[in-house]
């Protein structure tokens, strides 16, 4: 059975890595993805509402997204929300659906996105290491108070370090995958 301290550490680190993974999914890659629109809110009867709660978003094969609002009167609101976002895309409203065409990104844009992905992953690594530092301090306090032995402290420190290495490696893999996704075209 796992030690509660190790279990708590693993849960925190996993949560941190999952958060970074979600952030990377929202990063633009030149490839259309409905996840890019998750943060955009549409004025739905005075309430800011995510696009995916008022419309269907589909990826088409020709490098575009099709947004079909469930209510036709939302077309203009969805279009305005996309224009106001920082995606830099020009929505085309044909009266029934909104089409978002993703132009082929320049090498410079791709490099900028890779740098952004690297920054996001670096923040994740810092979070994982901060969790390790916090838990190691907890272990020192437990030993100082006589709640655990020196052998237990060393064993737990080693387990915590192994978890840290595991999750930092996982973050590196997430970055490599995202970098590959950004650079391929």
From Swiss-Prot:
One cellular component (GO) term of this entry: cytoplasm
The entry's keywords: Cytoplasm, Protein biosynthesis
Subcellular location: Cytoplasm
Pfam families with a match to the protein in the record: RRF
Signal peptide from the UniProt entry: none
Biological process annotations from GO: translational termination
Major location category of this protein: cytoplasm
InterPro entries to which the protein is assigned, alphabetical: Ribosome_recyc_fac (IPR002661), Ribosome_recyc_fac_dom (IPR023584), RRF_sf (IPR036191)
Record family assignment: Belongs to the RRF family.
Task of the protein: Responsible for the release of ribosomes from messenger RNA at the termination of protein biosynthesis. May increase the efficiency of translation by recycling ribosomes from one round of translation to another.
Name of the protein in its database record: Ribosome-recycling factor
Lineage: Bacteria, Thermotogati, Thermotogota, Thermotogae, Thermotogales
């Amino acid at each position: 059975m796992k030690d509660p301290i190790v279990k708590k550490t693993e849960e925190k680190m996993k949560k941190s890595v999952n958060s970074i993974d979600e952030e990377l999914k929202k990063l633009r890659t030149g490839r259309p993805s409905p996840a890019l629109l998750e943060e955009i809110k549409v004025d739905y009867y005075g309430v800011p509402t995510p696009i995916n709660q008022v419309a269907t978003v589909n990826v088409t094969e020709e490098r575009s997204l099709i947004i079909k609002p469930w209510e036709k009167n939302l077309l203009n609101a969805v279009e305005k929300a996309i224009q106001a976002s920082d995606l830099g895309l020009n929505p085309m409203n044909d009266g029934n659906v909104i089409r978002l065409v993703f132009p082929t990104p320049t090498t410079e844009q791709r490099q900028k996105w890779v740098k952004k992905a690297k920054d996001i992953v670096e923040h994740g690594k810092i979070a994982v290491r901060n969790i390790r530092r916090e838990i190691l301090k907890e272990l020192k306090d437990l030993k100082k108070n006589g709640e655990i032995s020196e052998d237990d402290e060393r064993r737990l420190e080693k387990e915590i370090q192994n978890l840290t290495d595991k999750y930092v490696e996982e973050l590196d893999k997430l970055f490599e995958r995202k970098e590959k996704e950004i650079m391929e075209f």
